[in-house]
Amino acid sequence: PKKEVVFFAIGFETTAPVHMMALKEAQRRKLSNFSLLTSLFTVPPAIDAILSDPGSKVDGFLTAGHVCAITGNSAYHKLAEQYKTPMVVTGFEPVDLLYGIYRCLLQLEG
C-alpha cells in the first residue's frame, strides 16, 4: 500500500472497543499503512467541567447504564455529592429514561 490510512478514533469510553477492533483487524491483515489517531474521553471529567462553570444551569444528569456496567458508577457518586446534583444511571428505552427523570426529580425535591 502506497497511502497511509489514518483512522480518527474519536468518542467516549463506549467507542473504544470498536476502535480497537479496527486496529486488531489491521494487525491481523498485516497492514503496515494503518494508523490510529485517538481522541477518547471519559464522561465524568466532562460532567465536572460543566458543573464547575459558575454559569451552569444543569439540574441533573441521566448517565448511561452501558458505561456504568463497565466502569461502575462511583465517579458519578463523587460528582453528585460534590456538586449536589442528581445523577441517575439509566438505559435508553423510553421507560428507562422516564424513570430516570422521575428519580432525578425526586432527588431535586428531597
Per-region residue spans from a language model:
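Class I S-adenosyl-L-methionine
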Residues: 1-6
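A conserved active-site cap/scaffold subdomain adjacent to cofactor or substrate pockets
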Residues: 55-110
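Phosphate/pyrophosphate-binding betaalpha-module
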Residues: 8, 12-75
